């Protein structure tokens, strides 16, 4: 299974959630609403989830093993950093 596309939508509001991401696998299957969160130990991803009646959050879709989670997280955070850096460069050029 290959990650063939990662689309990042940055969140403008202040807070721990930095972006919402869609990831396409093998140009055939997409998972939307993966969140990029800033935690105490740096950035991490949170898979799409829903709130149960008792207030608990359950993942809708998620990797089954650590290796796959790390692969997805690496691709998402890499693309997030690119988007973040591109916007910083654009903002600096506008200010000059």
Curated annotation (Swiss-Prot):
<dbReference type="Pfam" id="PF04026">
    <property type="entry name" value="SpoVG"/>
</dbReference>
<keyword id="KW-0131">Cell cycle</keyword>
<comment type="similarity">
    <text>Belongs to the SpoVG family.</text>
</comment>
<protein>
    <recommendedName>
        <fullName>Putative septation protein SpoVG</fullName>
    </recommendedName>
</protein>
<keyword id="KW-0132">Cell division</keyword>
<dbReference type="GO" id="GO:0000917">
    <property type="term" value="P:division septum assembly"/>
</dbReference>
<dbReference type="InterPro" id="IPR007170">
    <property type="entry name" value="SpoVG"/>
</dbReference>
<dbReference type="InterPro" id="IPR036751">
    <property type="entry name" value="SpoVG_sf"/>
</dbReference>
<comment type="function">
    <text>Could be involved in septation.</text>
</comment>
<keyword id="KW-0717">Septation</keyword>
<dbReference type="GO" id="GO:0030435">
    <property type="term" value="P:sporulation resulting in formation of a cellular spore"/>
</dbReference>
């Amino acid at each position: 299974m290959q990650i063939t596309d990662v689309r990042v939508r940055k969140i403008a509001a202040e807070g721990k959630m930095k972006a919402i991401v869609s990831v396409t696998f093998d140009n055939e299957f997409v998972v939307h609403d993966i969140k990029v969160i800033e935690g105490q130990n740096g950035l991490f991803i949170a898979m799409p989830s829903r709130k149960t009646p008792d207030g608990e959050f359950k993942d809708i879709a998620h990797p089954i093993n650590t290796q796959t989670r790390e692969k997805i997280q690496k691709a998402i955070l890499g693309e997030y950093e690119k988007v973040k850096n591109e916007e910083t460069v654009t903002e600096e050029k506008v200010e000059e």
